Regions:
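Helix-rich effector regions associated with P-loop NTPase G domains
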Residues: 2-3, 56-59, 63-84, 90-128
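N-terminal pre-Walker A segment at the start of P-loop NTPase domains
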Residues: 2-24
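Hydrophobic anchor at the beta1->P-loop junction of P-loop NTPases
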Residues: 35-37
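The conserved Walker
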Residues: 41
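Conserved lysine of the Walker
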Residues: 45
């Protein structure tokens, strides 16, 4: 697993750009990748993930599914052929124990992880 070894920053202000960048990402990501998305409420983090997952589904000739924010469930899972994708929304998570209870970090090497509101993770890493 690579953590922060190749950080990139994208400033997306238009939905069409979000769609285009998600198409490029869908060609580059693979198992073991962790993508953290930052931004205020309503800036398009979930929209980016929706486009990304739907691009991966099309690329792998699988049916496109509805991609919704996991704000209340904390995580949504998508299986595309043999690729497991975890979509996390950590907005409501108060402490790292909540993540441990759902098995967060257990399968990072075997999946693609898309994380909205990853700031809690940074706090935990800084405190170690």
């Amino acid at each position: 697993m690579h953590i922060g070894t190749n950080p990139k920053k994208f400033n997306i202000t238009e939905e069409e750009n979000t769609k285009l960048i998600s198409e490029k990402f869908s060609e580059l990501i693979s198992k073991g990748d962790v993508i953290c998305l930052h931004g205020n409420l309503g800036v398009g983090k979930t929209t980016f993930i929706k486009y990304l997952i739907n691009n991966l589904q099309r690329k792998n000739n699988t049916e496109e599914t509805e991609v919704a924010s996991p704000t209340f469930s904390i995580v949504n899972e998508y299986l595309i052929n043999d690729n497991l994708i975890y979509h996390y929304d950590l907005y409501r998570v108060k402490n790292i124990d909540e993540l441990n209870n759902i098995g967060f970090l257990e399968d990072f090497n075997k999946s693609i992880s898309l994380i909205e509101w990853p700031e809690l993770l940074y706090k935990k890493i800084d405190n170690q």
